[in-house]
Amino acid sequence: MEHYLSLLVRSIFIENMALSFFLGMCTFLAVSKKVKTSFGLGVAVIVVLTIAIPVNNLVYNLLLKDGAIVDGVDLTFLNFITFIGVIAALVQILEMILDRFFPPLYNALGIFLPLITVNCAIFGGVSFMVQRDYNFVESIVYGFGSGVGWMLAIVALAGIREKMKYSDVPPGLRGLGITFITVGLMALGFMSFSGVQL
C-alpha cells in the first residue's frame, strides 16, 4: 500500500506532467483562462489518463510485448499506433458522454476536447508506463495521479490568470508573455519537490 501511495504522490507533485515534463502545453496554455473550464478539462484528462494507461498496459502486456502472443514474436513496433488508437477511442467515447450529459462543459471545451487525443500528456503517461514497466494496478494509480497533477497545475494557472486580468501588467508582457513567466515560476515551485524521496 505504501508503494502505491508513494507512486501517487510522485505522479502528482514530483513528476507532474505539466510542470516537470512540460507535456500537454498546447491545451494547458489555451484553456487556462477560466477556472471552471480548466477544471472541466482537468477532469476529462483525469478520466482519460486513468482509463488509457491501464488499458494500454493490458494491450501492451497481452498483445505487443515480446513473446506475449507467441514466443519469438515481437510486436512492440506497433506501440505508437496502437496506443494512439486506444487513446482516440477513449476520447471519442468521453466526447459523446459530455455532449449527451454535460452540454455546457462540452461547448466550453470546444475544439480542445478532441485535442486530448493528441495531448502529449496522455501519450507521455502511456509511454512512461511502458518504459517503467508498471503492472496493472500501478498503471491505474499512475494514470490517476498524473491526471490529478495535470489538473492541479491547469486549475492553479487559471486561478492566477483570472487574478492577473485585473493587474497592471506591462504592455509587452500582456497575454502569453506573462503566462509563460507564470508557468515558469510555477514549475520552479514544483521543482522543489524533486528532492523528496518516498
Swiss-Prot record:
GO biological process assignments: respiratory electron transport chain; sodium ion transport
Q: Please give the Pfam families that the UniProt record associates with this protein.
A: Rnf-Nqr (PF02508)
Give TM segment ranges.
Answer: 11-31, 39-59, 77-97, 110-130, 140-160, 176-196
Q: Which InterPro entries does the record associate with it?
A: NqrDE/RnfAE, NqrDE/RnfAE_oxidrdctase, NqrE
Query: Main site of residence?
Result: membrane
Membrane association type: Multi-pass membrane protein
How is this protein organized at the quaternary level? Composed of six subunits; NqrA, NqrB, NqrC, NqrD, NqrE and NqrF.
Protein function: NQR complex catalyzes the reduction of ubiquinone-1 to ubiquinol by two successive reactions, coupled with the transport of Na(+) ions from the cytoplasm to the periplasm. NqrA to NqrE are probably involved in the second step, the conversion of ubisemiquinone to ubiquinol.
Family classification: Belongs to the NqrDE/RnfAE family.
Return the protein name: Na(+)-translocating NADH-quinone reductase subunit E
Its organism's taxonomic lineage begins at: Bacteria, Pseudomonadati, Pseudomonadota, Gammaproteobacteria, Vibrionales
Q: What is this protein's gene name?
A: nqrE
